[in-house]
From Swiss-Prot:
InterPro entries: AceGlu_kinase-like_sf, Asp/Glu/Uridylate_kinase, Uridylate_kinase, Uridylate_kinase_bac. ATP binds at residues 13-16, 55, 59, 163, 169, 172. It comes from Bifidobacterium longum (strain NCC 2705). It comes from the Bacteria. CDD domains: AAK_UMPK-PyrH-Ec (cd04254). Belongs to the UMP kinase family. The lineage of its organism: Bacteria, Bacillati, Actinomycetota, Actinomycetes, Bifidobacteriales. Keywords: ATP-binding, Cytoplasm, Kinase, Nucleotide-binding, Pyrimidine biosynthesis, Transferase. PANTHER family: URIDYLATE KINASE (PTHR42833), URIDYLATE KINASE PUMPKIN, CHLOROPLASTIC (PTHR42833:SF4). UMP binds at residues 54, 74, 135-142. This is Uridylate kinase. Its EC number is 2.7.4.22. Pfam families: AA_kinase (PF00696).
Length: 246
């Protein structure tokens, strides 16, 4: 599925909500299924890095509304991402897949520090690398981190796994029955129309560096594998003209 001389390298972004199954904490069945779908892609030669969110535990912006200092709330969210990283690492290793966690905040007993060249070396050896603790700084979303990490470790594509939708639509498909799914979507259209791809700062970084983003639905069985190996599912956000599915 991938050229051994030029292997496909991707970054998979998973939201904290995906890990929680819509609830606080982690849904082990969901994480196990995601792990089971990652392994076949790695076995086909795809190099897989992952950024996970922490929204199933804490969200800094929401904690701020409750009176908690925004920076402190963001750090709480970063620690939540590390719990998700360790859970996913465990399920991947249960499947026999060597996995490393690297965190932007040093915590030597549970993870390696984030070192880009070391991460690349792990990927080249067939290990999955999971990045935790966001950027290690407040006010940076895990969407922004996913673009930044993908640029630093030279990924071909960023894959955004979404719950509840199978791509990016012209309007909210849950509210508008006439909403159509984009097959391709330009960065500018996504930004101007405020379409639900990722936050604006992350999308601007992707546009400025021409980093392709594929948005796909997480809930369809097998979709994670399909996205990782390069199947054209969901919506591709790039410099190409926007086009809706027929």
């Amino acid at each position: 599925m991938t050229d051994s001389d030029n292997p496909r390298r991707v970054l998979l972004k998973l939201s904290g909500e995906a890990f929680g199954g819509g609830k606080v904490g982690i849904d082990t069945q969901v994480i196990r299924r995601i792990a089971e779908e990652i392994v076949p892609a790695v076995q086909q030669g795809v190099q897989v890095a992952i950024v996970v969110g922490g929204g199933n535990f804490f969200r800094g912006a929401e904690l701020q509304q409750a009176g908690i200092d925004r920076s402190r709330g963001d750090y709480m969210g970063m620690l939540g991402t590390v719990m998700n990283c360790l859970a996913l690492q465990d399920f991947l290793e249960q499947e026999g897949q060597a996995t490393r966690v690297q965190t932007a905040i040093t915590m030597g007993q549970v993870a390696e520090p984030y070192i880009p060249l070391k991460a690349i070396r792990h990927l080249e050896k067939g290990r999955v690398v999971i990045f935790g603790a966001g950027a290690g700084m407040p006010y940076f979303s895990t969407d922004t981190v996913s673009i930044q990490r993908s640029l630093e470790i030279h990924c071909d594509e960023v894959l955004m796994g979404k719950n509840g939708v199978d791509g990016v639509y012209t309007a909210d498909p849950r509210k508008d029955e006439n909403a159509k799914r984009f097959e391709t979507l330009s960065y500018n259209r996504a930004l101007v129309d405020n379409l639900a791809v990722m936050d604006a700062s992350a999308l601007s970084m992707a546009r400025d560096n021409k980093k392709r983003i594929r948005v796909f639905g997480l809930e369809e069985p097998g979709n994670v594998t399909r996205a990782l190996v390069g199947d054209e599912i969901g919506t591709l956000v790039s410099t190409a003209e926007s086009r809706v599915a027929e």
